[in-house]
Curated annotation (Swiss-Prot):
Belongs to the TrpA family. The lineage of its organism: Bacteria, Pseudomonadati, Pseudomonadota, Gammaproteobacteria, Enterobacterales. The alpha subunit is responsible for the aldol cleavage of indoleglycerol phosphate to indole and glyceraldehyde 3-phosphate. It comes from Shigella sonnei (strain Ss046). This is Tryptophan synthase alpha chain. Keywords: Amino-acid biosynthesis, Aromatic amino acid biosynthesis, Lyase, Tryptophan biosynthesis.
Amino acid sequence: MERYESLFAQLKERKEGAFVPFVTLGDPGIEQSLKIIDTLIEAGADALELGIPFSDPLADGPTIQNATLRAFAAGVTPAQCFEMLALIRQKHPTIPIGLLMYANLVFNKGIDEFYAQCEKVGVDSVLVADVPIEESAPFRQAALRHNVAPIFICPPNADDDLLRQIASYGRGYTYLLSRAGVTGAENRAALPLNHLVAKLKEYNAAPPLQGFGISTPDQVKAAIDAGAAGAISGSAIVKIIEQHINEPEKMLAALKVFVQPMKVATRS
């Protein structure tokens, strides 16, 4: 958890936001996946958001579902994902590492055992995508027992009660959901991002990182201009992996070319 605090403090001093890429562990295979993660960090990633392949990924669009299928095709198991996490942590002692996953994977291990394992390999945060905040007590309590930050999603239409709960229960960072790709009526109830950010700040929530549909440096800049502490980009990165699936070296080069300007956009 402290890794997030020290990251945000350092970034504030440098007048920068955080750029955080998301990839699925083990996509397209363990060895290349580790190279991908090294490349993302070398290109300027401030923290990592990593998925563990799961057979029924509800919140994921087709791009990330395909990443999961590629990892499964390579025979990647949750146990191997934890071995990978330990290796990443050994190599990169200071970078915050977050997991984005589903409750079933936590239940399979037993909630307490899962978070104990996270602590052991050096994971800083866990976001369980399919557990609403009102059902989160056993997860967040186990997380805190094991020095892992419980992360909560703040949707664009969050009401005051939800904002207060997120501020009170969340640690590390707050996952601020952008309104990417949502049109028409659903859009109307959504508050402007800077209003949400101001409220979260008022309630002393963990710093907000904006995610969902972030694929250009301009979007990163806009998130930070609205008051977010940074931006998370997933599908755009996973798409690059997909496009260069048979050219591992080209893939790494393309990832670097994508990440560098995204990081530059965080500097005010």
